Amino acid sequence: MVFENIIVEKKDRIAWITLNRPQVLNALSQELMTELRGAMEEIGGDDSVRVVVIRGAGRCFGAGGDLKQAREMVSDLRGARALLENWHRTLFAVERCPKIVIAAVHGFALAGSLELVMACDLAIATEDARIGDQHMNYGLASAGSASQRMPRLIGIRKAKELLLSGDWVSGKEAERIGLVNKAVLADRFDEEVSEFAAKFASKAPAPARLIKELVNWGMQADLNTAITLELLAATGGGTMGATTEGMAAFVEKKKPEF
């Protein structure tokens, strides 16, 4: 697949996807979202990759959807549905990718760009980043998953506060409330992101994939069903190689090699 709106690079078990529309603050056009979905699907089948990092070129992670394009598309219901279906397919491709997906946020991640961040497994941001869903400020209700993913991440009351007010929070505050995993100094951002990604890339891929799937499945099931799924998955044999290596390393007091 040829990419015009994103850049894909692979190195040391990590795939780096850069949203590359800096001239419009990485606004998420239909073309960019289609390319991102294609990249996630391709990377999902690449055994050399264990971690994906999604970041933005230029001043920010992203200012949200491409409103100029969206305004043209939503003039009728068919266009609006096509836009949102493409959007949701892409976010599900990110969320369901068998790799660990990390959002690296600098500058700001607003509205649709925040929805992309929330579809990732993990997120790291600069302390001074501005992060928020601003649909309410323009008389809009979220239609890109914020109303569903945000409360699952930070709880119902805080999610309602941010969604209904249209306020943004700093990266540091986003870390405190659980919207991102880690907030770091801006002048160490690149190094911190690389170290964060490398930590997860060093882990065994089969159990990592299984844990991701179990957590995602479990969020949609009652506790008893979710624990049963965990039991069945853990005894299915798919992670046996990593389990054997890990146990041997523990007994022999050495570092496991995955």
Model-flagged regions — what are they?
Residues 21-22, 46, 76, 203, ...:
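Short loop-to-helix capping motifs
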Residues 1-57, 92:
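Conserved CoA-thioester-binding segment of acyl-CoA-metabolizing enzymes
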Residues 219, 255-258:
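Short C-terminal tail/terminal secondary-structure segment
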Residues 56-93, 109, 137-139, 222:
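Glycine- (often His-adjacent) and acidic-residue-rich active-site loop
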